Amino acid sequence: MITISAFKWVPPFAQGQVRDLRARWALEEAGLPYKTHLLEQGDQDKQDYRALQPFGQVPILEEDGLVLFESGAIVLYIGERSETLLPKDAGARCRATQWLIAALNSIEPFVMNVALIDLFYANEEWAKLRRPGAVEFVQRRLSALSKSLGDKPYLDGDRFTAGDLMMTTVLLILKHSDVVTSDKRLAAYIERCTARSAFKRAFDAQIGDFKDAA
């Protein structure tokens, strides 16, 4: 059975944000059973964990001797067993992969710039000066994303794929603000994707682990 590493507990602002949610969601979409290896704070810095994940992050996926880190790689691995995530059609499959990579490379770095300021440095003078520029940059990317989405329900048209899964989790990083949801098209897109039963099961599973540890 697949095992996913996750934190046993994180502060409330980070709950529903930790990257193991991406792996859990993908597994739920694929209908694959899994179990979690819950880490206490500090476990991620231990030598045995760093041997598997050099950056000390979650999640790690383990299955039959295979160890994978990085949520993008993990979602693609799971997607190999799910036509929902990675369609059989070669073109659609490539586009799903394209959007997954776009979420991680073209959107997430700009989203994280704002999130780090808001969640960790909001009262610092340098952050107050830096935030308007960071918001401007992310809004440019979000505007381009919204334009590409257009009136389609999902990034590649009528079907949800791994690209939508990854993009949604990236956009949710800014759920504490209206930077994303001020765009009605993107707000509706997030609502549509998070209404999926697989997302709800994944989210509830992550939050359930945190509640058990509280």
Regions found by a protein language model. Give the residues of each.
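Short, solvent-exposed turn/loop segments enriched in Gly/Ser/Thr/Pro and often Arg
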Residues: 40, 162, 206-207
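A generic structural-conservation signal
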Residues: 36, 87, 158, 183, ...
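Short beta-strand segments
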Residues: 6, 166-169, 204
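GST-like fold's C-terminal all-alpha helical module
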Residues: 103-195
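GST-like domain detector, emphasizing the conserved glutathione-binding G-site
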Residues: 1-129
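Long hydrophobic alpha-helical segments typical of transmembrane helices together
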Residues: 185-214
